[in-house]
Amino acid sequence: MLEYKYMNSDSMNLKEKKEFGDKARVAREKLSLTQTDVAKKANMTVNYYAMIERGEANLSFEKMKSIVKVLKLKITIS
């Protein structure tokens, strides 16, 4: 299981967005899921999910939780 450490703040900085996107991509590939699979299960568009993987999207904590659940990631909040 991959782990992502979320720093509790109002918004993620560019480095944090990229780190989360990279972890999401690795986890998705390990589960043999497509971006479309994850997007549908997490209730978001494929384009938005692709932006998350590239570290380009502003990501709410609720959306992050949806992705974490689909990808079976562990999240630590500090």
Task: Map each language-model feature to its residues.
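Short alpha-helical segment immediately N-terminal to, or the first helix within
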Residues: 16-17, 27, 33, 41
